Amino acid sequence: MMLPDWKIEKEILIEPFSKESLQPAGYDLRVGKEAYVEGKLIDVEEAGNVIIPPKKHALILTLERVKLPDDVMGDMKIRSSLAREGILGSFAWVDPGWDGNLTLMLFNASNEPVVLEYGERFVQIAFIRLEEPAKRPYRGNYQGSRRIALSKRRVRK
């Protein structure tokens, strides 16, 4: 069962929480403080925006920390306004028990650069209640992330 707006506000820890981002059956996550584009870490808060060049991908940190109970998972979709500009998103499930800011991958399939402003709503997350709490909620490599998290596959020695 997907959670409606009033249950999201009551049951899911999202900080900082924005009433404007709360949707009937989801929450719009906003562009956070960091991005990673073409091998460079960008301070989006200081720069005011991040530019995703044509035919390139970017990792974008969410402004919000999301903490899920052990019986709720998240499913994310790119906002349609960005999809209409050629932005594609590849997002994993947000597992029950997750706690942290999310690092999300966007790809600019267009021939024009796309600018994302700091604090702009860019991805909607919907919350789905499981029939029962997970026996093994998420406690993996990215748990507690507050900054851009690059792939742990490339960090291995």
Curated annotation (Swiss-Prot):
This protein's name: dCTP deaminase
Any Pfam family hit: DCD
UniProt keywords, alphabetically: Hydrolase, Nucleotide metabolism, Nucleotide-binding
GO biological process, one term: dUMP biosynthetic process
Self-association state and partner proteins as the record states: Homotrimer.
InterPro entries given in the database record: dCTP_deaminase (IPR011962), dUTPase-like_sf (IPR036157), dUTPase_trimeric (IPR033704)
HAMAP family: dCTP_deaminase
GO molecular function: dCTP deaminase activity; nucleotide binding
Domain of life of the source: Archaea
Pathway recorded for this protein: Pyrimidine metabolism; dUMP biosynthesis; dUMP from dCTP (dUTP route): step 1/2
Family: Belongs to the dCTP deaminase family.
NCBIfam families, alphabetized: dCTP_deam
Entry function: Catalyzes the deamination of dCTP to dUTP.
Recorded catalytic activity of this chain's protein: dCTP + H2O + H(+) = dUTP + NH4(+)
Signal sequence, start to end: none
Binding site residues for dCTP: 79-84, 95, 124, 138
E.C. number: 3.5.4.13
PANTHER family: DCTP DEAMINASE
